[in-house]
Regions:
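Short amphipathic alpha-helix that is part of the acyltransferase structural core
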Residues: 1-28
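Conserved beta-hairpin
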Residues: 18, 32-47
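Charged phosphate-binding loop/patch that engages nucleotide di/tri-phosphates or the phosphate backbone
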Residues: 140-151
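Short, conserved, surface-exposed binding loops centered on an aromatic residue
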Residues: 27-28, 37, 56
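Acyl-donor binding region in acyl/amide transferases
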Residues: 8, 32, 50-140
Length: 151
Protein backbone atom coordinates (compact mmCIF):
# COMPACT_ATOMS: atom_id res chain seq x y z
CA UNK A 1 0.00 0.00 0.00
CA UNK A 2 1.31 3.43 -0.83
CA UNK A 3 1.71 6.15 1.73
CA UNK A 4 -1.44 7.68 3.22
CA UNK A 5 -1.64 11.46 2.89
CA UNK A 6 -4.05 14.03 4.27
CA UNK A 7 -6.06 16.58 2.36
CA UNK A 8 -8.39 19.34 3.52
CA UNK A 9 -12.09 18.71 2.94
CA UNK A 10 -15.18 20.85 2.97
CA UNK A 11 -17.92 19.73 5.36
CA UNK A 12 -20.09 18.76 2.40
CA UNK A 13 -17.38 16.44 1.02
CA UNK A 14 -16.78 14.75 4.37
CA UNK A 15 -20.50 14.26 4.97
CA UNK A 16 -20.97 12.77 1.51
CA UNK A 17 -18.26 10.20 2.25
CA UNK A 18 -19.83 9.40 5.65
CA UNK A 19 -23.26 9.01 4.06
CA UNK A 20 -21.79 6.54 1.56
CA UNK A 21 -19.53 4.49 3.83
CA UNK A 22 -20.31 4.77 7.55
CA UNK A 23 -21.80 1.59 8.98
CA UNK A 24 -24.03 3.11 11.66
CA UNK A 25 -23.98 6.92 11.73
CA UNK A 26 -25.40 9.74 9.67
CA UNK A 27 -23.33 12.77 8.70
CA UNK A 28 -22.75 15.63 11.16
CA UNK A 29 -24.12 19.18 11.04
CA UNK A 30 -20.91 20.89 12.11
CA UNK A 31 -17.37 20.24 13.29
CA UNK A 32 -14.24 22.11 14.36
CA UNK A 33 -12.06 20.57 11.66
CA UNK A 34 -11.99 17.67 9.26
CA UNK A 35 -9.57 16.06 6.85
CA UNK A 36 -9.46 13.33 4.28
CA UNK A 37 -7.07 10.40 4.00
CA UNK A 38 -5.89 9.78 0.45
CA UNK A 39 -3.97 6.91 -1.16
CA UNK A 40 -2.86 7.26 -4.78
CA UNK A 41 -5.17 10.24 -5.22
CA UNK A 42 -8.24 8.33 -4.01
CA UNK A 43 -10.17 9.40 -0.91
CA UNK A 44 -10.12 6.37 1.41
CA UNK A 45 -11.21 7.93 4.71
CA UNK A 46 -12.46 11.01 6.51
CA UNK A 47 -12.09 12.21 10.07
CA UNK A 48 -14.28 14.89 11.65
CA UNK A 49 -13.45 16.46 15.00
CA UNK A 50 -15.73 18.70 17.08
CA UNK A 51 -16.48 19.84 20.59
CA UNK A 52 -17.57 16.93 22.79
CA UNK A 53 -21.19 15.96 22.25
CA UNK A 54 -21.67 15.53 26.00
CA UNK A 55 -21.85 18.94 27.65
CA UNK A 56 -20.29 17.41 30.78
CA UNK A 57 -17.09 16.76 28.83
CA UNK A 58 -17.07 20.09 26.97
CA UNK A 59 -14.49 21.87 29.13
CA UNK A 60 -12.90 23.99 26.40
CA UNK A 61 -9.75 21.85 26.41
CA UNK A 62 -11.19 18.65 24.95
CA UNK A 63 -12.17 17.68 21.42
CA UNK A 64 -14.04 14.61 20.17
CA UNK A 65 -13.59 12.59 17.00
CA UNK A 66 -17.27 12.57 16.05
CA UNK A 67 -16.87 10.67 12.77
CA UNK A 68 -14.11 8.47 11.45
CA UNK A 69 -15.07 6.62 8.32
CA UNK A 70 -13.05 4.62 5.80
CA UNK A 71 -13.67 2.53 2.74
CA UNK A 72 -11.95 -0.38 4.49
CA UNK A 73 -8.41 0.39 3.34
CA UNK A 74 -5.67 -0.94 5.62
CA UNK A 75 -4.19 1.31 8.34
CA UNK A 76 -6.41 4.30 7.53
CA UNK A 77 -8.22 4.33 10.90
CA UNK A 78 -4.98 4.37 12.91
CA UNK A 79 -3.57 7.04 10.61
CA UNK A 80 -6.64 9.24 11.09
CA UNK A 81 -6.76 8.85 14.88
CA UNK A 82 -3.06 9.77 15.12
CA UNK A 83 -3.44 12.74 12.77
CA UNK A 84 -6.53 14.03 14.61
CA UNK A 85 -4.62 13.94 17.91
CA UNK A 86 -1.63 15.78 16.41
CA UNK A 87 -3.82 18.50 14.92
CA UNK A 88 -5.77 18.93 18.18
CA UNK A 89 -2.49 19.23 20.10
CA UNK A 90 -1.18 21.84 17.64
CA UNK A 91 -4.39 23.81 18.18
CA UNK A 92 -3.70 23.86 21.93
CA UNK A 93 -6.15 21.23 23.18
CA UNK A 94 -5.10 19.00 26.05
CA UNK A 95 -7.25 15.94 25.37
CA UNK A 96 -9.11 14.19 22.57
CA UNK A 97 -11.82 11.55 22.96
CA UNK A 98 -13.95 9.26 20.84
CA UNK A 99 -16.52 6.53 21.31
CA UNK A 100 -16.74 3.11 19.69
CA UNK A 101 -19.39 0.43 19.97
CA UNK A 102 -18.54 -2.13 22.65
CA UNK A 103 -18.62 -4.76 19.89
CA UNK A 104 -15.66 -3.10 18.11
CA UNK A 105 -12.10 -4.09 19.01
CA UNK A 106 -10.48 -0.66 19.34
CA UNK A 107 -7.31 -1.98 17.68
CA UNK A 108 -6.83 1.20 15.62
CA UNK A 109 -7.15 3.37 18.71
CA UNK A 110 -4.75 1.25 20.76
CA UNK A 111 -2.27 1.24 17.86
CA UNK A 112 -2.29 5.04 17.78
CA UNK A 113 -1.77 5.59 21.51
CA UNK A 114 -5.34 6.02 22.77
CA UNK A 115 -6.52 4.40 26.01
CA UNK A 116 -9.86 3.29 27.38
CA UNK A 117 -11.24 6.02 29.62
CA UNK A 118 -14.78 4.83 30.38
CA UNK A 119 -17.58 2.52 29.38
CA UNK A 120 -21.08 3.88 28.86
CA UNK A 121 -24.43 2.16 29.16
CA UNK A 122 -25.50 3.43 25.78
CA UNK A 123 -28.91 4.96 25.35
CA UNK A 124 -30.40 7.90 23.59
CA UNK A 125 -30.24 11.67 23.95
CA UNK A 126 -34.06 11.65 23.81
CA UNK A 127 -35.72 12.93 27.00
CA UNK A 128 -39.37 13.71 27.77
CA UNK A 129 -38.45 17.37 28.22
CA UNK A 130 -36.42 17.46 25.01
CA UNK A 131 -37.51 15.02 22.32
CA UNK A 132 -34.93 13.77 19.84
CA UNK A 133 -35.01 11.13 17.14
CA UNK A 134 -32.23 8.61 17.61
CA UNK A 135 -30.78 7.00 14.49
CA UNK A 136 -27.46 5.87 15.98
CA UNK A 137 -27.04 2.58 17.84
CA UNK A 138 -28.08 2.88 21.50
CA UNK A 139 -25.89 0.00 22.67
CA UNK A 140 -23.12 0.34 25.28
CA UNK A 141 -20.03 2.16 24.05
CA UNK A 142 -16.40 2.53 25.08
CA UNK A 143 -14.86 5.99 25.39
CA UNK A 144 -11.21 6.24 24.43
CA UNK A 145 -9.00 9.23 25.09
CA UNK A 146 -5.54 10.49 24.41
CA UNK A 147 -3.89 13.07 26.64
CA UNK A 148 -2.19 15.65 24.44
CA UNK A 149 -0.58 17.81 27.10
CA UNK A 150 -0.55 18.01 30.86
CA UNK A 151 -2.57 20.90 32.25
Amino acid sequence: MNRIKTIPLELRQANEFVDNFHRHHDSVHRDKFRFGAVVDGKLVGVCQVARPVSRHLDDGNTLEVVRLCTNGSKDVCSFCYSKAARIAKELGYSKIITYILNSESGASLKASGWQIEAETKGGSWDRPSRRRTTTAPIVPKVRYSRILRKE
